[in-house]
Amino acid sequence: MWERSRYVGAVAASGFAIIAAACGGGGSSVASETPAQVLAAAVSATKGATSYEISGTGSFSGGISSFDLKVVGTSISGSFVTSGAAIQLVELADNIYIKAPASFYTAAGASSAGAALLAAAWVEIPAGSSYSSDFSSLSNFSDVSSQLADAGTVTSDGTGTVNGQSVVFIKDTGGTVLAVASSGTAYPVQVKETGTTAGTYDLSNWNSIPTVTAPPNPLQLPSS
């Protein structure tokens, strides 16, 4: 259901490949709908959303233990923790900006002086550069509706409460469980995965995230 592995698998691909309730207005209850109808309602709701926040914790590949990202259209801002290093991130107009501690850059092979220089500022990875392709999996988080639409066959997994929100649970054949708001707009509230890439994603703040802006005065990596 949720192609998280494509995203986190790109995180440590190279020195700069860092990648790295539900609330809403009207809408009818999905509490009495079939699992397929619940999924369709969640896909429709996410397609109509202008922004949202997604956060996660778990044992992710690339050493990632947590992330918190705000998505506005195709733009993303937020942070993640990988191998103990907290990284700030902005993606805007296909440009990637990161701010990381010196330890992150020295682990990637930078000299102490170079790492200190990079850590003191935001670093811009220009669109079309050889480094930017390492961040292509970020699109997974700016297109939740497509991720949900790939769920395939789903079955009912009961009802409950997640983050104070009444939800309906549905489960795909791989064991991933999706919690969908059972009243109001059928926004996804949480995704839980099991197995080797086990993790939990919370989705919230639908249609209420401010516009993403570029950080000031970034250092720019070469375009090649």
Q: Which residues does each predicted region cover?
A:
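C-terminal motif of bacterial Sec signal peptides marking the signal peptidase cleavage site
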Residues: 19-22
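Sec-dependent N-terminal signal peptides
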Residues: 6-16
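Subset-of-secretome marker
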Residues: 2-8, 24-224
